[in-house]
Amino acid sequence: MNDRIAIEGHDGAFAAYIARPKTVLAPAVVVLQELFGVNADIRKHCDELAEQGYLALAPDLYWRQEPGVDLNVTSDGSILNSARHLATGFRASLV
């Protein structure tokens, strides 16, 4: 079963994509997004891990700047620049 969930953090709630295996008890992995957010590629990777018996969770790392980023992997300069801008903001939010 695949779903989006909300996780409460100390400074607010953020979304995550979760893919669950058929078994109730399973090892878990955290799948970190690339520049493009929790997009179709990341969700597919989580789904494949669930098919292999893992619970896979992909948190939305950009939630403080722009929740729900889902950019297509492309060579389009404007999308690539947006992704780089979000990644820079993410790094700044860690300090």
Model-derived regions: residue spans:
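N-terminal cap/leader regions of alpha/beta-hydrolase-fold enzymes
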Residues: M1-V95
